[in-house]
Amino acid sequence: MDKYGNTEWENSYSLGAFGNGRSVIQTQDGGYLYAGWKGIVKADANGIEEWKNTSRQNGAYPYYEDVMQHSNGFYYAVGGPGAGQAQLVKFNETGNVLTRKWYGGQCEDDIFRSIIETPDEMLLIVGEKTHGNQSYSCAFNFMYYKDIWIVKTRTNGGVEWEKTHGGPYMEMANDIAPIRSGGYMLIGNKCDHLYDIGSCSQKAKVLIMQIDEEGNNLNQEVIPGLKWMERIPYYSITTTNDGYAWAAEHKNNGTWIYQVIPNTDPSYIYTDGFGGFEINHTTDGGFIIGTMDGLIIKTDSELLY
């Protein structure tokens, strides 16, 4: 679409009934790359499909959650779980798999959710790592016993370092964005369910964390009101010149867009749609938000639309 929201072209790409699109990016050649639970699809600048890759190794599907193109020209997709592990897959520009690496897996359901390139041209990945509960080293209700998981790798997938942040219950990271002055902001969710996992529908909160270049927690904030969905988190964060903004779904009020600028009170709005599948800072200083039901919202810098 153009900058006014008018459709320039549209196309559809089949990844089967369980495709469940999770990420789309514009590539260096002006085309687009789409990633979902069953694979990835590359299209040209006019939306014409160029190639598709649905290969997998562990599990029924590759379960991609995010994809990026590195400055080296290669594509990197992350996701999981496959046999309990998270994965990082490196593709060349024609869609062939060059490297597939697996991480975690001590307990079931380790997942990578988001990937970005670091200033030193490595990869930084965030997601969720499963741990035990009060009775077992690996909890049976594994989706409710998680830590925020941050992994830095080289471009071949070799681990530089990894960190986890969390307590005895549930903390997850879903998206990460760089800060201009250094470090990163990430968004996730937190539920102190006190071993009553059914209470997360009322107790789930948005978790915002600032980390440094080594993944250390510098600051965090939790905001109540998040609508909790068990398997498909749909919240996203973007940074601005002097702050950040995020989008999620409020449990009572639809799409929830929230902006933080230092030394001012936070501003937020509730609007139509289901959640903040993706939020990006636009060149005019505003924001564009994609929701889970396909609604696209464009705001100005003050969240007016």
Model-predicted segments: where are they?
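A sequence-level/structural motif corresponding to short, flexible coil/turn segments enriched
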Residues: 1-305
